[in-house]
């Protein structure tokens, strides 16, 4: 158990589950999209749906979508900043099935780019992402994370793992899912540190890889992680 588990995260209140966790989930969705979104739709499940306004979940989700970390004081005026940056957003209630009560599905758009991420806020600012664009994956935002869409072909996972190992980077977790045999597949890979630029470029051009995003670790505050909080800038790889 860490000190964070005892005292909770540094954040704009009132609730680590409903504010810090929600903000981090939206921030991860933004990085998965790869650019500043122009449209955001939040489908709120369970406790999130019941307390979205009272606990600031709606503000936290919009702030994370704009690039903010949970300790950013501008979360309180996230709706105003969203208007300034041309972000259209709405939130609805939804039954997402047998999942954690603090769960949200985040659908982001920008031009012809779209991403849908579903995750849960587990308490203490901790989060778990378990679905991306219909693929069952698993990552926490506590490590740099690679999201790789590829064709379900023998050897792809091994080749990706070899590139990571050759870059002297250790894999913390690797989860793979596919729609059907021989069809589209997705990997979520948590790693101990970000890949070098050459390794990242090599992965993007690897045979059978069709899409790649590199997500930063989001469990630290905005200063430590050099966030692009509420800036509207593009920060992810193409």
List PLM regions with ranges.
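Short, hydrophobic/aliphatic alpha-helical segments
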Residues: 1-11, 40-42
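Alpha-helical scaffold segments in soluble metabolic enzymes
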Residues: 5-6, 24-32, 60, 64, ...
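Conserved phosphate/anionic-ligand binding catalytic regions in large, soluble enzymes, centered on
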Residues: 8-28
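Non-transmembrane, aqueous-exposed alpha-helical and coiled segments at domain scale
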Residues: 30-41
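A structural-propensity feature for long, helix-poor, extended segments
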Residues: 41-84
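Short glycine/threonine-rich loop-to-helix capping motif typified by GTGT followed
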Residues: 51-59, 101, 185-193
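Contiguous domain-boundary segments centered on the initiation and propagation of an alpha-helix
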Residues: 66-115
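A conserved regulatory-domain signal marking ACT and ACT-like small-molecule sensing domains
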Residues: 77, 89-94, 109-231, 235-238
């Amino acid at each position: 158990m860490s000190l964070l588990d005892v005292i909770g995260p540094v954040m704009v209140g009132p609730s680590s589950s409903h504010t810090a966790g929600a903000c981090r989930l939206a921030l991860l969705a933004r990085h998965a999209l790869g650019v500043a979104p122009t449209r955001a739709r939040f489908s709120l499940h369970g406790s999130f749906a019941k307390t979205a306004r009272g606990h600031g979940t709606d503000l936290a989700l919009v702030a994370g979508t704009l690039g903010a970390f949970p300790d950013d004081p501008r979360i309180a005026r996230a709706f105003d900043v969203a208007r300034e940056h041309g972000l259209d957003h709405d939130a609805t209630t939804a039954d997402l099935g047998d999942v954690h009560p603090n769960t949200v599905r985040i659908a982001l758009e920008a031009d012809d780019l779209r991403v849908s991420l579903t995750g849960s806020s587990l308490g203490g600012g901790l989060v778990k992402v378990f679905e991306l664009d219909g693929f069952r994956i698993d990552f926490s935002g506590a490590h740099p994370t690679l999201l790789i869409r590829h064709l379900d072909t023998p050897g792809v996972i091994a080749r990706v793992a070899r590139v990571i190992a050759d870059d002297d980077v250790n894999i913390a977790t690797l989860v793979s899912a596919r729609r059907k045999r021989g069809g589209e597949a997705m990997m979520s890979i948590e790693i101990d540190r970000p890949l070098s630029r050459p390794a990242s470029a090599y992965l993007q051009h690897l045979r059978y890889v069709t899409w790649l995003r590199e997500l930063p670790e989001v469990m630290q505050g905005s200063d430590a992680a050099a966030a692009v909080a509420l800036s509207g800038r593009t920060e992810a790889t193409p």
